[in-house]
A protein has these predicted regions:
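Aromatic/hydrophobic pocket-lining residues that form π-stacking "cages" and hydrophobic walls in ligand
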Residues: 29, 196, 346
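Trp/Phe/Arg-rich N-terminal binding region typifying the photolyase-homology
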Residues: 1-79
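Terminal-tail/helix-coil boundary detector
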Residues: 466, 471-491
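Conserved, well-ordered alpha-helix/loop/beta-strand core segments that scaffold catalytic motifs
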Residues: 182-215
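Short acidic catalytic loops
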Residues: 38-45, 200, 206-212, 282-294
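Alpha-amylase-like alpha-glycosidases and glucanotransferases acting on alpha-linked glucans and related
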Residues: 9, 15, 53-186, 190, ...
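Surface-exposed amphipathic alpha-helices with a cationic face
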Residues: 34, 193-201, 326, 350-351
Length: 491
């Protein structure tokens, strides 16, 4: 069945608290999607973020981001009582001020923990039994805060850094309240997420999640299971991820994420990946796998190299991993972010897995149309069509900044003149395409310019902060989307 959806992260929702959350605005947006005829809500990775606030550099592949917990919902559920005169952080219409939000939300979550933990203990204990990663993640987060937030390889106590048994016990006792607090936050996040997901699913809306292929160097994952990664005896990465030099970057890109020990994981029957994907399948109905090509072949760069030029391509786990995942998780629905260097091995793996790849309309008008896989005339059914993604400029921003030749190619093919009708033309392009799914960022639905861009790759600061203004998702907008969905048979 042909479907369509909106890409908008939870943090971008409007409302009190300074950041979007799993509160009433999330439910209202689900109502908007239902009215619009949209069957997909795509979000960015939901893990806890730190320096830079990138959802793609999370402290855990399993944990949820406590900043997305709705404190208003905690009050409504009787888990948080505010003092007279105490208020939520006021609504900020357009940008998330992360430091301010974190300070304020931490204060309210600590208060909810002290008021409510005791009454929730039976449920929390069951949560700990069901989600075995939580205990280590809570300890990791408590110790990290204890040492001022420095990355775990720089912790001054060698015992806890290397996870010696006596040190684990010592810190668990010493930081008991903080550990319990972080368990509480995870319990609340997943409780609110489950309620939210049930609401969306009951309206026929599938939650479309996002999963980075790699983990952050400074994460509970590398601290808890260092044997899974290419680390030396001091737990420093031996080699890191990235991509080679190309037309856009003479030095390539060095992402810095530690690489997997794929041979070791093969002998463990890929259990680490099975558990990771099992967690994703609980969170989401569909999972977009970022940098999917890394399963076919991945670029390996020596740790400490000045750039990515000295890296080399290495064969990835390929079909062996996905045979295991198919056996253990037969209902797992995956979309491959297959942007980047396409090789025969990548194409063969995509065919074996059978999952849709991606097409991005704003990538489609540079160079020769016949050789451009993103040119709309080259799209086919087993793809997800996007006007753009979180890493691109908005479509209005793209129209304003594209070079003359590229813009003329788009105007000639899509038949538009100005910015507003151009954005509309791109939206109609993806909705009318043969692709099985079509996804439009909310910024494009609202015809917003570059000021609403979510992320500018290669930059630090100012990213991930866009928020939709209250009242922007109007009935008129929903009605127009529904008319297009009906016209292009996506309802």
């Amino acid at each position: 069945m042909r479907k369509s959806g909106i890409l908008m992260h939870i943090s971008s929702l409007p409302g009190a608290g300074g950041i979007g959350s799993l509160g009433k605005e999330a439910y209202a947006f689900a109502d908007f999607l239902e009215t619009s005829g949209m069957k997909l809500w795509q979000v960015l990775p939901m893990g806890p973020t730190g320096y830079g606030e990138s959802p793609y550099q999370s402290f855990s592949v399993h944990a949820g981001n406590p900043m997305l917990i709705s404190t208003e919902k905690l009050v409504a559920d009787g888990l948080l009582t505010l003092d007279p005169g105490e208020e939520f952080m006021p609504t900020q219409d357009e940008r998330v001020e992360f430091d301010q939000v974190r300070e304020n939300k931490e204060k309210l979550l600590r208060k909810a923990f002290h008021q409510s933990e005791k009454g929730l203990l039976p449920e929390i204990r069951q949560f700990l039994r069901d989600e075995r990663w939580v205990s280590d993640f809570a300890l990791f987060t408590a110790v990290k805060q204890h040492f001022g937030g420095v990355m775990w390889r720089q912790w001054p106590d060698e015992g806890i850094k290397m996870r010696r048994k006596e040190s684990l016990l010592q810190y668990r006792m010493m930081l008991d309240e903080d550990v319990r607090y972080h368990v509480f936050c995870q319990f609340i996040f997943f409780r609110q997420w489950k309620e939210f997901k049930t609401y969306c699913n009951n309206k026929g809306i599938a939650l479309f999640g996002d999963m980075p292929i790699y983990v952050a160097e400074d994460s509970a994952d590398t601290w808890t299971q260092p044997e899974v990664f290419q680390l030396d005896k001091n737990r420093a990465p031996k080699r890191v991820a990235g991509v080679p030099p190309d037309y856009f970057s003479a030095d390539g890109q060095m992402w810095g994420n530690p690489l997997y020990r794929w041979t070791y994981l093969f002998f463990r029957r890929y259990d680490w990946w099975v558990e990771r994907m099992r967690g994703m399948s609980k969170l989401y109905d569909i999972v977009r796998v970022d940098h999917f090509i890394g399963f076919a072949n991945y670029y390996s760069i020596p740790y400490g190299a000045p750039n990515a030029r000295s890296g080399k391509w290495i064969v990835g786990p390929g079909k062996k991993l996905f045979r295991r995942l198919k056996k253990e998780l037969p209902n797992l629905r995956v979309v491959a972010e297959d942007l980047g260097v396409q090789s025969d091995r990548v194409r063969e793996l995509l065919k074996f897995v059978g999952c849709p790849g991606m097409k991005v309309a704003t990538f489609g008008f540079g160079g020769d149309a016949d050789g451009n896989q993103h040119f709309p005339g080259n799209w086919s059914e087993n793809y997800v069509a996007y006007t753009g993604t979180h890493d691109n400029d908005t479509t209005a921003g793209w129209i304003a900044t594209a070079d003359e030749t590229t813009l003329k190619a788009a105007k000639d093919y899509l038949h538009f003149d100005g910015t507003d009708d151009g954005v509309e033309a791109f939206i109609r392009c993806v909705l009318s395409s043969p692709c099985c799914m079509a996804v439009v960022p909310m910024q494009d639905v609202l015809h917003l310019g570059s000021e609403a861009r979510m992320n500018l790759p290669g930059t630090i600061g100012g990213n991930w902060a866009w928020r939709m203004k209250p009242g922007a998702a109007t009935e008129d907008v929903a009605r127009h989307l529904r008319e297009m969905n009906q016209e292009y048979q996506r309802i």
